[in-house]
Amino acid sequence: MNAMLNIKEGEFTSTIYTLIHEHKFNDAIRILQYQHERNPKNLAALSLLGYCYYYTQDFQNAADCYSQLSYNYPHHSQYKLYHAQALYHAFKPAEALNVVTTIQDDDLLNESIKLEAAIKYQEDDLVNCRILVDQLPTDDATVLINTACIDYKEGNYSEALQKFNQATEFSGYQSGLAYSIALCYYRRGDYNSSLQLISEIINRGIKDHPEFHIGMVTEGFDVNVVQNSMTLHESALIEAFNLRFAIYYKTKDFKAAKECLTDMPPRHEHDYDPVTLHNLAINTANTDFGDSSAKLQFLLGSNPFPQETFANLLFLYCKNDYFGLAADVLAENPHQSFYCLNEYQFNLLEALIYMPTSPEESLKKLEKLDKECMTRLRKIAVEIQIKKEQKTSDKDDSLEMRNLIESYEDELELYLPVLMTHAKYYWDKRDYLAVEKLFRASNEYCNEHHTWKLNVAHTIFMQEKKYKEAALFYEPIVNRKYDGGILEIPAMVLANLVVCYIMTNQTDEAESILKTVENAEENALMSNPNEKYFHNSIISLVIGSLYCSKGNFEFGMSRVVKALEPPEKKLGVDTWYYAKRCIVAAIEMMAKNILVMRDSVVMEVIQFLSSCEIPGRNIYTVPDDLFEQAAESKVKCNVTYEARMLKAALLTVFHGS
């Protein structure tokens, strides 16, 4: 043990306290562990070891230390209290309660009652929690805070807010209290007030704790990770960044939400708290299904985990068509189904899961959900109209109006998944008229919603003869970010609008979009030269696919090949998908002797396929599968393998003709 060898005789105690004072807890823990192994009954070493574990939030090891101390020194009631506190923080409420009930020291009575109340709070036993808190002295600020926490958990956010503010006046500024107030504002829908308090917490953290490297990862600096510690916990920085993430995510400012996760003090992944891990998972849900689902699965097996984890994992499975897995998780966790899912979520999940096997039953559930959502939407719409007619300028009434509007928007967010699930059933059957009929029926309530307008545009576009009407829906979506953030618009939206323009002879408008996207990609590459940008490629691929579908394969294939030059920069999962569709269609037509292409075009395609082999090795053509795959099958799931197969097939039909 080198650390021990470096300590001079007689300097053991001063060395340990110096390490603790300098927050070098890992070094102190290593020395204390060694000392404890040499002398298991060393009171000082074991007590300090428990303290270090507790400070670094390793509560299970802290509980083990205090368990030994309370066993070896039963008359030291303080150790029993520390043992119970460590078990409580390790989320073992039953064990913590067993320990705290053995404390008989009158001097620790109030602390014991506080801890027992906290345990009841953790178990959601709010009735007994309030009874215990009422036994405590009323002049204690922590009692006021505890009462506020109970009010918050009961949904009485205004009362909780008032008590947290009183506690702040009584105790002075504390980051934890400021966070609690911000959380109450968030629950009341007052996001501006919440964000102001969050900013204050973060600014104080930047000033008081430069060692936490706040915001440096976002700026691109390579910094050391931060360990979990009581100082980090008391700063409330992690909680503040996660709350800011929740606000931005809810208001659909996903870029700002992502920055919240990189702005917070950097930690190792194994040190992440459950809320941070959950937020990281939902942040990548649309881009990295495997990583997102793995994080949510891990959380589901942890204690505790955010209540939203269960629903988010199930909806993530359904979104990616893993209905069997979703059904298994639902069946294997009946307790979580009852605790974590409300009636709406449960019914929607059942409709999604059983749609492939029992569509009639699923459609009945969806129709029932549809009616329930529409009823609530109509009710809130009437309340909003009444409020508007009153035309009051009172602040409370203004907040009430804002809350009504937010309730309407929240209800709309509940209705849209029902509508889209219903529409998807007909979409998969290519019954686009039925889909359009569903959307028209919801026009009164959804016509301002971005998702609704986008899906209406797609539905009209797929009917082929309604390109002009489809363009009218796509144009507002594109125009919102045309001049500054065109690359933030999904490439398929731009591609479909370009096709609409081409099919309605509006070539100038189509060229304008292509030029704007090209310039935006060039500017983006100057800032991030190692990044890949696929918008221009996907648009060109869709245009190429359009010409192929109209029978002009030679021009279409040339457009496809040029869209992916150079492959090192342009090859990706999406771009390869559109390219290979055209190539497969051409091979099929040539094999049937329906199509004859010039030799130069065929050789151009063969050369393109050859150029895809090297950059395509690490581009997998199937989503991350949750089932273990054999090594051989995984080799066949990348661009390299598919490019070689297509080249062989193309050469076969080319020489055969």
Swiss-Prot record:
Protein name: Tetratricopeptide repeat protein 30 homolog
Record's keyword terms, sorted: Cell projection, Cilium, Cilium biogenesis/degradation, Coiled coil, Repeat, TPR repeat
Lineage: Eukaryota, Metazoa, Ecdysozoa, Nematoda, Chromadorea
Source organism superkingdom: Eukaryota
Gene Ontology molecular function: intraciliary transport particle B binding
Gene: dyf-1
Species whose genome carries this gene: Caenorhabditis briggsae
InterPro entries: TPR-like_helical_dom_sf, TPR_rpt, TT30
Principal place of residence: other
PANTHER family: TETRATRICOPEPTIDE REPEAT PROTEIN 30 (PTHR20931:SF0)
Subcellular location: Cell projection, Cilium
Coiled coil: none
